[in-house]
Amino acid sequence: MNQQNPEEEVSLVNNSGGGGIIEAPAIVEEKEEEGLQQKQEETIESTDPILVVVEEKLLEKSVDGEKEDDNSSSSNMEIDPVSPATVFCVKLKQPNSNLLHKMSVPELCRNFSAVAWCGKLNAIACASETCARIPSSKANTPFWIPIHILIPERPTECAVFNVVADSPRDSVQFIEWSPTSCPRALLIANFHGRITIWTQPTQGSANLVHDATSWQCEHEWRQDIAVVTKWLTGASPYRWLSSKPSSGTNAKSTFEEKFLSQSSESSARWPNFLCVCSVFSSGSVQIHWSQWPSNQGSTAPKWFSTKKGLLGAGPSGIMAADAIITDSGAMHVAGVPIVNPSTIVVWEVTPGPGNGLQATPKISTGSRVPPSLSSSSWTGFAPLAAYLFSWQEYLISEIKQGKKPSDQDSSDAISLSCSPVSNFSAYVSPEAAAQSAATTTWGSGVTAVAFDPTRGGSVIAVVIVEGQYMSPYDPDEGPSITGWRVQRWESSVQPVVLHQIFGNPTSNFGGQVPTQTVWVSRVDMSIPPTKDFKNHQVAAAGPSVDAPKEPDSGDEKANKVVFDPFDLPSDIRTLARIVYSAHGGEIAIAFLRGGVHIFSGPTFSPVENYQINVGSAIAAPAFSPTSCCSASVWHDAAKDCAMLKIIRVLPPALPRNQSKVDQSTWERAIAERFWWSLLVGVDWWDAVGCTQSAAEDGIVSLNSVIAVMDADFHSLPSTQHRQQYGPNLDRIKCRLLEGTNAQEVRAMVLDMQARLLLDMLGKGIESALVNPSALVFEPWRVDGETITGINPEAMAVDPALVSSIQAYVDAVLDLASHFITRLRRYASFCRTLASHAASAGTGSNRNNVTSPTQNASSPATPQVFPDKSLYLAVGQPTTTTTTTATTNSSGSSHVQAWMQGAIAKISSSNDGSNSTASPISGSPTFMPISINTGTFPGTPAVRLIGDCHFLHRLCQLLLFCFLQRSSRFPQRNADVSSQKLQTGATSKLEEVNSAKPTPALNRIEDAQGFRGAQLGTGVKGIDENSARTTKMGSGNAGQGYTYEEVRVLFHILMDLCKRTSGLAHPLPGSQVGSGNIQVRLHYIDGNYTVLPEVVEAALGPHMQNMPRPRGADAAGLLLRELELHPPSEEWHRRNLFGGPGSEPEDMILTDDVSKLSNSLDLPDTNFSGICDGYNRVHSLWPRKRRMSERDAAFGSNTSVGLGAYLGIMGSRRDVVTATWKTGLEGVWYKCIRCLRQTSAFASPGATKQPNPNERETWWTSRWVYCCPMCGGTWVRVV
C-alpha cells in the first residue's frame, strides 16, 4: 500500500504572458536530499528527486486551456476579461512503483477532483483518478486511488500513498483535514463507503518527529453511501471581521478584540478530539470517534462508533446534508428530504434511543451496568460528548477485564436519536413547479446545503438547481438545467404570535413566552448555467462518442446536460458542492462539470469564477489556511497525471486600469489575514504567496503591506502583546523579503534572523533552568559587587541538560561576538568618515552626515553618503547594485574614491589602527553620526544597537553564560588536558581538510595568540593562568571561548546597556500613507538613537581582548558579510530570473531562450532524460549567490574550512540542540521553509533510541512540530 518515488512537475504560470521558455530540472543540488528513502512499515515517506518544470501558458478561463465555443450565448456572470491570478501550477505523477503495474483503461476508470488544504501543516492532499492493476501483477490491489500530499511552500516535497478502491468507478467522495484544534489527521471517504483515517506516526518517544510527508493508516471502516462525511469540531472562539463589521473601526484595539467571539461562553463544551459524522443517503446519521484523551503514543488509539440514528426524512432518504456542533455543544444536521427537495430540515442529534425507550445492548455486561446518559465523570462537557466518553470509558474497562466485544456489538449499544428543531422552504421556480407534474419526476430543488462553520448553526448556505430532472419521455437524456440559485439563510429565535383565542401564552407555557426558530433569506442570487451545459464537448482524453443531438427547438432542449456514457456522475443527486473557508469569510460554490464561483463576506460579493475541466464531476476547491488562495485539482488524461493549481483569491485578478484604485484597501486586508493566522495558530504561507503574487501584478506594494503590519504591531496596547507577536512578525517579514536584492533590506533580514535566534536561545535556556525566575531581569542596573556575588548555583541547570545547555551558551557567545564585531567596525567607519568629511570641508553642519532616524517618514539625502535610491520598493526594478552609489553634485571625485576605499576597508577582516583608536582622540571637528539610521545600510547588526529588547535580552543571557563559565572555573585543572587535546585535534583536522588558511585567518589566530599572552601576564599561578586561557565549548567555529573573552563580551554589553538606558526609546511612527515607505525593523520596547561615539566608548577599553569571530556556525552565519538568507522557495517565479517557461513537448528553441538564460549558472550535473536540443536552457537557479547561500546555510564550502565537522552529509549545526553534528548518528530532518537541519529527533519506526535521557528527550520534543527559527514543518532528508 505504501508507495515511493512520486514524480512531480511544477508549472509557474505568469498571467501577463510572454514568450520565454525555460525547462530544466531545478532540484539538481538537492539530489542528495531528495533521493530514495528507506521504506518503513506502514509509513509513507518523501521520495525521489522530483522534476520541476517551469511552464508558461496564457491562462484562459478554462484551467486546462480548452477554449470555449465562441458561438455560445454568454451571460453577465461569465463575462470576465481578467483571468484568475495563478500562484503556481503543479503536475503530480504517480511513483514508478505504481506506474509499472497500472493498466491504461481511461474509458473504464473514473476521473474526479478531491482536494483539501491543512491549515496547521500547510499541506495539500489531493486525488484525481482511480487506477486499475494489470492482470499479470499482484503488487498492488486490483484498484487504487493515489493520494498526493504536497507542501505548496516547497512542492518538491511530495508524498504519495494509495487508498484501496472497490471498483474502477470508485472515487474519493470526501477528503478533509482534521480541525486545527485537533491532532493532525486526514479523512478520506470513498464513494463506495470505504473510510480511512491517515495520521502521522505517533507511537514512540516524546521527541518523535512529526514528518509532514510521513503518513500511515490509523483506522478504517465501511459504511453505506453517504451524502456527507466530515469532521466534527466545537464552535471556534474566533470570529472573522466580516461577521463583526463594526470591530474594524477601532484601529487601536487588539487583535483579540477584533477577532474573538463576542458570544457568551457556554458551560457545555465540545472537546478537541477526532470525531467523524456521516449522514447517509438513506436518511440516518452515525458517529465515529477516536479515544480521548489519547494515551500519549504508547499504543495505537482505539476508535469507537455509534449505532445509526434515524433522521426521519421519509422513505426515500435525503438529497444533501451537513452537520455542525452549535455554540451550546449540540449537534445539528441540516438535510433535504427527497420527498420534498425544496425544504431544508434541521435535526438535533441527542444521546440515547429517544422516546424514553431503553436500548438492550448485545454485549455481555456481566456485573457492570451500561452508563447512564448523565455520567458525573464528564461534567462540563456537551451532553453528546459526555455520552460518547461514558461509553468509551465503559468499553475500555470491559477490554481491560478480558472481555472483547466486537465492534459491531459495541456500536449497536451506543444509540442516537434525532428530532427536528426547525425547517424552511427554499425557492422553487414557478415555471418548473407548474411543469413538474407533467414532464418531470420532481421540479427544481436543493442540491447542496452547508452550515457556516463559524456561526454555530445559525447560518446555512443553499444551492438550488433550477430546471427539470429526468424526463419521462427520454430518461436517458438526463436532467436539463436552466440555472442555479445561491442563497444564504440566517436563523433567529422569535416569540410565537398566538391569537387571543388561545389565551395568555405565558400562563400556558409555564411563565415562558413560547419561541420558535425563524429562518430569513439574506442572500438570493441567480447564476446562469455555464457554457459547457449549453454545448458540452467531450473531454479530449475521453473516448470518441457521438456528438450531442442537435436541439429540435427552443432553449429548453439546448440546456440539457448530455453525459458521456463512459463518464456518468457518481450521484446524479449531487450537482453542486459548497465549500466554506475556515473563518467563514469566503465561500466557494462548485457546480457539476467544473464551474467554480467564489464569494466573500455575508453578502456573497462575487470575487472570482473559473472553469475546471473535470467532465461529469464537481471540482470543489480547497481554501488555504487564511483563504487568501484556493487550490483546485483535476486529471490531465493527455499527460496522465494530476494537475494542482493554486489561484489567488485575495486580492483577485484585476484589470490593469483598476489595480491601483484600492491598493490601501487590499494591503489592509492582507495584513488582517496575517494577524488572523497568528491569533488562530495556522500557517501564513498562503498570505505570503498572495502578497508576492499581488505585488508582481502591481495591485499592492510589498513595502506597504509590511508598513501596515508594523503600524498594527506598534499600536498594540502592551509590551506583553508585542513580545508575543514580535518573533512571528520577524518570521513573516523575513519570508516576505526572501530573494530581495536591496542590500539594506538583506541586512535587515539578517538582523531579524539574529533576533529570532536570540529568542530561541533565551527560551531554551529558561526551560533548562531549575528556577527560570533566577535570571536577573536587568543586570546593567545592578552594581558590580552584586553581580560578582551571585552564586552560580542560583542559576543551576537541570543536570540532565548540562551538555545541551553548553551548546546554547556557545551560540549566545557567537551571536554576541559577531554583533559586537560589526558594531566596532561600523563605529570606526563612521568616525573616520566624519573626520574626513570635516577636514575635506564638505560642511560643518551635523546634518551633512546624519541620516534621519527611523521615526522620520521620509529620508533626507546626505551629501557624502550613498544615494538614498537604495531605498527603493522591494520588488521594483532598480539599477543600484552596490552600496557605493554615486554621490550628488556637491561631492568631489576624491571623496567618492575615499568612500569606496573606506567601505572596502570596513568589509575586510583587517581592522587597521582605527579599530583600537581611543574614542576621545581624532579630529577636533569630529561630527557624530546616528548609528542606527541606515548610514551604511548594507551592514548587519547596526540597527540592533537601537533595539532595546534585543540589547537587554542579550545582556541578560550573557550574564548567564558568564556565570556558567565561572562555575566551571575551579574544575578546570582536571579538564585542561582533555580540552587541549580536543582543540588540538580540531586544529589539525582543519589544517588537513581545509585549503590554505587565508591571511585574514592567520591574522585572527595570531591576534588571539598575542591576546592570550597578554592575559597571561599578571595572573597569579600557572594553573589559574592556563585555566583562564583555555578555550571551552565548541563555539566560534569549534575553537571555543576563554574565560576572559566571555567576561569581556559580558562587560561590553553591560556598558552598552548602561550608556543607553537613559535614552528615550519611542516606538517608531507609522509609515502608512507615506509616499516613500521603507522596510524597517519593528521594535518590542522601542528603539534608541545611539551615537557611534557611545559605541566606541563602550568598546574602547576592551578592544584588545575581544574575541574575533571565525568560521561559519549557526549564529555566525546570520551576521556574516555574505548576502546570506536561508533559501526556501527556489521554485517561486520571483526567484526564477526568466520567469515562465513551457512543457518539453511544446518547447520551441528560439533566440529568446538563450537571452533569458544567458546569466544563469548551470551546475555540473548530468541531466538525464533531457534532450540535447535543450542544452541551451539553463537551470532554474537564478544566481550564483543562491548556490553560495545554500552552502553557507548548511555550513559547507564556506570561506573558512570546518575540518572536523565535515561528515558524510556535510557540515551542519543542529538548530534544535545547537550542537555540531557530523551526520553519522541519528536521522536528519530539514525544515521546509529555511532548510535548517537537525538530527535531534526520534524517527518513526526506530527500534533503538540514541539518547535514553528522558529529560533531554523532553528538551528536544519542544520542536517536533516545527522549526524553532522560522516555524516551518519538518521533512526527512534523504
From Swiss-Prot:
Q: Any idea what a deletion of this gene does?
A: Late flowering in long days. Very low expression of cold-responsive (COR) genes.
Cellular localisation? Nucleus
Question: For bias kind Polar residues, which ranges apply?
Answer: 841-861
Record's compositionally biased regions (Acidic residues): 1-10
Gene induction: Not up- or down-regulated by cold.
Alphabetically list the UniProt keywords. Answer: Jasmonic acid signaling pathway, Nucleus, Transcription, Transcription regulation
Query: Region labeled Disordered — which residues?
Result: 1-21, 530-557, 839-861
List the record's Gene Ontology CC terms alphabetically: mediator complex; nucleus
Q: According to its UniProt entry, what is the function of this protein?
A: Component of the Mediator complex, a coactivator involved in the regulated transcription of nearly all RNA polymerase II-dependent genes. Mediator functions as a bridge to convey information from gene-specific regulatory proteins to the basal RNA polymerase II transcription machinery. The Mediator complex, having a compact conformation in its free form, is recruited to promoters by direct interactions with regulatory proteins and serves for the assembly of a functional preinitiation complex with RNA polymerase II and the general transcription factors.
Q: Which family does it belong to?
A: Belongs to the plant Mediator complex subunit 16 family.
Subunit details for this protein? Component of the Mediator complex.
- Could you tell me what this protein is called? Mediator of RNA polymerase II transcription subunit 16
Species whose genome carries this gene: Arabidopsis thaliana (Mouse-ear cress)
